[in-house]
């Protein structure tokens, strides 16, 4: 039986690398995969999933209006799909998560979703909220804070490198705008108003 998987983490935990490896594993066995990524995130070029270690794959784009079940069913009828993989799945809508569950339940195609659990305010993304609620399997991909603890929070930094937790939920950026940290140092950085000061303090402890 196919299942719906949600692989979640903070930033820079290797989600895209894990997705590309999973896709490769299917293809190596002669199976066909379809990869989706969010239209909104084009840091590495539109229409592809890229990892920080240099791997990449062509990808179909989804936005809030995409009818994923209809798209996948139509393509599956043309040529069998053995696995659907979705990068940046935090940007899915509630309806799209439901449609992906239908891909699993009605078409018997496994769906592997990769994305962030929470935003820079510590709030769940809509896509992540419903994947946490409806997935068959939840898998945390771990990355670490500068202190060595598990990093479960994402700090947003302004142009001067100062952390803040107000404003729009979605501002696309790479390392220059977001940093993964543990909960303790997330709270401390916001209280002090400087991630650098917290890092310096930690080095001297």
UniProtKB/Swiss-Prot annotation:
Q: Does the keyword Cytoplasm apply?
A: yes
Protein name, please? Thymidine kinase
Q: Give the annotated active site.
A: 88
Q: Which family does it belong to?
A: Belongs to the thymidine kinase family.
The UniProt entry, under PROSITE patterns, shows: TK_CELLULAR_TYPE
**Localisation per UniProt entry:** Cytoplasm
Q: Which organism is it from?
A: Escherichia coli O157:H7
Gene expressing this chain: tdk
Q: What does this protein do?
A: Phosphorylates both thymidine and deoxyuridine.
